[in-house]
Amino acid sequence: MNPKSNPDTIFSAPIDKIGDFTFDERVAEVFPDMIQRSVPGYSNIISAIGMLAERFVKPHSNVYDLGCSLGAATLSMRRHIKQEGCQIIAVDNSKAMVERCKLHVNAYRSDTPVNVIEADIRHIDIENASVVVLNFTLQFLSPEDRYVLLEKIYAGLRPGGILILSEKYVFEDQVSNELLIDLHHDFKRANGYSELEISQKRSAIENVMRPDSKKQHKERFAQIGFSSYDVWFQCFNFGSMFAIK
């Protein structure tokens, strides 16, 4: 479950000069509302991440949530982890997100410890991992950093370990791509966002979020050496994949 938050009104008034989107204090305050109203199927993905973790986590192993934001995926996994000696390492480079994540994590009791770290995920060591989650995070890295991070994750996964990668997708067929973008905008309108909010948010985020196609993701997985990989969830141009070592 996601923590409650204030309503997202960040882009509701006209902005003269729209800067790049950042996960700052303002965004952290409204993030649960923002992501529920912006990402189709988000709650389903969070719930299923917990179920996948339950299947794949091994005793005395590490579980990583890279780009943890407020800890929704971390909390979902922690509810499902029954194995002994496991710890969740939740990492985000936003101080505002990390501070709130710690509050959310500490609000629930569990036998599985969670270590919330403020750091750049590109500089985190991945060791003895049975589960690694990148939930709408990879798309914010530069294209050249994505392969390097995935290689590091693969090296740090135990055999049989799983990477769960949720992303926004771009589609190679132009008609399909435009249709799915339009459907996503319809989804946002249905959730109360105005045309101004949709337009300004898109302008703010287009320079910092550069989505890949599913084909690009699968090609990377194959090149790195993952044995099995596929899409397990998709709604419009958002989805989630698994890759097993």
From Swiss-Prot:
<protein>
    <recommendedName>
        <fullName>Carboxy-S-adenosyl-L-methionine synthase</fullName>
        <ecNumber>2.1.3.-</ecNumber>
    </recommendedName>
</protein>
<dbReference type="InterPro" id="IPR041698">
    <property type="entry name" value="Methyltransf_25"/>
</dbReference>
<dbReference type="GO" id="GO:0002098">
    <property type="term" value="P:tRNA wobble uridine modification"/>
</dbReference>
<dbReference type="GO" id="GO:1904047">
    <property type="term" value="F:S-adenosyl-L-methionine binding"/>
</dbReference>
<comment type="subunit">
    <text>Homodimer.</text>
</comment>
<feature type="binding site">
    <location>
        <begin position="92"/>
        <end position="93"/>
    </location>
    <ligand>
        <name>S-adenosyl-L-methionine</name>
    </ligand>
</feature>
<dbReference type="Pfam" id="PF13649">
    <property type="entry name" value="Methyltransf_25"/>
</dbReference>
<keyword id="KW-0949">S-adenosyl-L-methionine</keyword>
<feature type="binding site">
    <location>
        <begin position="67"/>
        <end position="69"/>
    </location>
    <ligand>
        <name>S-adenosyl-L-methionine</name>
    </ligand>
</feature>
<feature type="binding site">
    <location>
        <position position="135"/>
    </location>
    <ligand>
        <name>S-adenosyl-L-methionine</name>
    </ligand>
</feature>
<dbReference type="InterPro" id="IPR005271">
    <property type="entry name" value="CmoA"/>
</dbReference>
<comment type="similarity">
    <text>Belongs to the class I-like SAM-binding methyltransferase superfamily. Cx-SAM synthase family.</text>
</comment>
<feature type="binding site">
    <location>
        <position position="202"/>
    </location>
    <ligand>
        <name>S-adenosyl-L-methionine</name>
    </ligand>
</feature>
<comment type="function">
    <text>Catalyzes the conversion of S-adenosyl-L-methionine (SAM) to carboxy-S-adenosyl-L-methionine (Cx-SAM).</text>
</comment>
<dbReference type="InterPro" id="IPR029063">
    <property type="entry name" value="SAM-dependent_MTases_sf"/>
</dbReference>
<feature type="binding site">
    <location>
        <position position="42"/>
    </location>
    <ligand>
        <name>S-adenosyl-L-methionine</name>
    </ligand>
</feature>
<feature type="binding site">
    <location>
        <begin position="120"/>
        <end position="121"/>
    </location>
    <ligand>
        <name>S-adenosyl-L-methionine</name>
    </ligand>
</feature>
<keyword id="KW-0808">Transferase</keyword>
<dbReference type="GO" id="GO:0016743">
    <property type="term" value="F:carboxyl- or carbamoyltransferase activity"/>
</dbReference>
